[in-house]
Amino acid sequence: MATFHYHYDPLDRLIQTAGIQRFYNQSRMTTEIKGTQRYSVFQQDGRLLAQQRRDRTKDECHLLGTDLQQSVLHAVGADKHHSMAYNAYGHRPVENGLISLLGFNGERADPVTGHYLLGNGYRAFNPVLMRFNSPDSWSPFGRGGINSYGYCGGEPINRVDRNGHFFGLVSLINILKLSLLRNLRTSFQMC
């Protein structure tokens, strides 16, 4: 039976597992290194933009297409377009491909278990069982909610859980920002 070790930094963020090192900018993962391969994710204002993969022989860049919850739906490279799909709780069949480092809700799936380690590794969410593997330390009477194993109060379409403690609504502010940007672009193009 294989044994895997998970290592955390002083801020309780997952930084190393099974030969993989992770680096963060604030609370979001920016780079992952495994052997000679290095993946870097580029973001702006919380929006995923692109991913770069580098190793000794070549560099690959992919532009990422996401939904409002930051789930990566498309990765467009120089020579190929990849599409990804998930069920409501983030499960993605293996044959669906893993071209992007990040996936459902912009989170990294653990390469060993396929679970999403939310809160930078605080708690593992199992998309097949549609629940967390361990209870929330803030439940049942805190902000974690009554069901200490539940994910997003049973409503993963309109809610997102970034830290493994409690969920929030998909930001109405982000929707308004996108609408405002579209209107500004249209107004600017008319000038």
Language-model-derived ranges and their functions:
Residues 2-4, 80-83, 87-89, 123, ...:
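Short turn/helix-capping motifs enriched in Asx and small/polar residues
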Residues 1, 16-20, 31-36, 50-56, ...:
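Beta-turn initiation residues at beta-strand->coil junctions
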